Each structure stands twice: as structure tokens, then as C-alpha cells.
């Protein structure tokens, strides 16, 4: 059993495709209450799963427990979050780390200034987080730093933040953008939504 544990720990520490670190970027929180509710949870909603699927021929609800993709990554592929002893760890982290980009913490007066960051500001902070994560995972290992990549998983406006990071040269350097291996977005308005006559993706080029 100890040998199995050691083997798992070694695999978790190694920078190796497809098990790169994963950064989750949540979507838009409209009201102050939604922001506070968001910042009050460790995973900002990404841990939400389900117990019901509607697949029975007679239309009845079938119970099926799906723990959420984030939890399944921990259970099935030995990923770990970066929380320990009540805080977010910044020292040596395994390659199979799950990180929540907590850009809304700044908007919660309990944690920050109370001012909601713009898409550009959140994207800039995301680039800084990627750099810190590389340093925490790789240290000064030159080969590991060269091999380091991350996956971005984004919901709703989080996808626009990821696009801003990758498409706006004023937000992140080419070195930071090159560390992003893949981006997965869902419910992201890539074609834009009209808010008071302003098309949201236009912010990406500002």
C-alpha cells in the first residue's frame, strides 16, 4: 500500500500530459449578495453536482449521483485542490493541482476593496496566477518550467476573461499565453450580448 501511495505521489508531482494543472474561472456575479455568496465557498460553485437525470422512457426522474467534474478529477485522477489548514497554499504544489481563480475576492469588502474588477483586470490577475502556479509547481527546475502548461476551464464571463488573457497583448506576455495548453468554456457569450448598447467582447481589445 505504501508503494502504491508513493507511486501516486510521484505521478502527481510530474509535469506530464495530459495531467497539467487546471485553473477554474467562474462566471458573472451580478449583485452584491451573489458576490458574497460566491466568495464564501472554496470552489465558487464548481463543486456543484447533481442527483437527477430525466432519461426514463416514461418521463420519470432517475436518480444518478454525479459529484461534479471537479470532484471526479480528485477521485478518479488524483488531482488535489490547493487548500490546507484553512488557507490557499503557495509553496510546492503537485502538477495535478486544481486552482480556483478567485478574482471576485477583491469585490468582497471582507477580502478586498469592494470594487468589482473589470474583465481586463481579472485577465491580468489570471496571468499572474498562472506564473505563480508555475513557480509553485516547478520551482527552479529548468526542464519542468519549460514543460509547464495549464488548462483553463471557464463558465460564462470566465470564458471572456480567458479570451482577454490570450488575445489582448497588453494583458499578458507571450510567455504567459504559451503556458495555456487548452481552454474549455461553457455558457460563454462568445458572439456577444448587448448591454446598454455595448457589445461585451469589444472590451477584449481595450
Predicted features along the sequence, with ranges:
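N-terminal non-catalytic accessory region
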Residues: 1-153, 157-206
Amino acid at each position: 500500500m505504501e508503494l502504491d501511495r508513493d507511486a501516486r505521489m510521484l505521478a502527481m508531482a510530474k509535469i506530464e500530459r495530459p495531467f497539467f494543472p487546471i485553473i477554474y474561472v467562474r462566471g458573472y456575479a451580478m449583485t452584491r449578495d451573489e458576490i458574497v455568496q460566491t466568495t464564501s465557498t472554496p470552489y465558487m460553485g464548481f463543486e456543484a453536482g447533481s442527483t437527477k437525470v430525466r432519461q426514463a422512457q416514461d418521463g420519470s426522474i432517475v436518480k444518478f449521483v454525479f459529484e461534479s467534474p471537479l470532484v471526479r478529477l480528485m477521485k478518479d485522477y488524483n488531482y488535489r485542490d490547493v487548500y490546507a489548514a484553512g488557507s490557499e497554499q503557495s509553496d510546492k504544489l503537485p502538477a495535478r493541482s486544481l486552482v480556483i481563480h478567485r478574482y471576485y475576492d477583491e469585490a468582497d469588502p471582507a477580502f478586498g476593496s469592494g470594487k468589482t474588477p473589470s474583465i481586463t483586470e481579472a485577465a491580468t490577475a489570471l496571468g499572474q496566477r498562472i506564473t505563480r502556479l508555475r513557480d509553485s509547481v516547478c520551482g527552479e527546475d529548468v526542464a519542468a518550467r519549460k514543460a509547464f502548461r495549464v488548462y483553463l476551464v471557464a463558465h460564462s464571463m470566465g470564458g471572456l476573461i480567458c479570451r482577454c488573457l490570450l488575445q489582448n497583448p497588453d494583458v499578458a506576455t507571450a510567455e504567459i499565453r504559451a503556458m495555456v495548453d487548452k481552454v474549455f468554456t461553457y455558457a460563454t457569450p462568445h458572439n456577444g450580448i448587448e448591454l446598454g448598447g455595448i457589445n461585451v467582447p469589444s472590451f477584449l481589445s481595450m
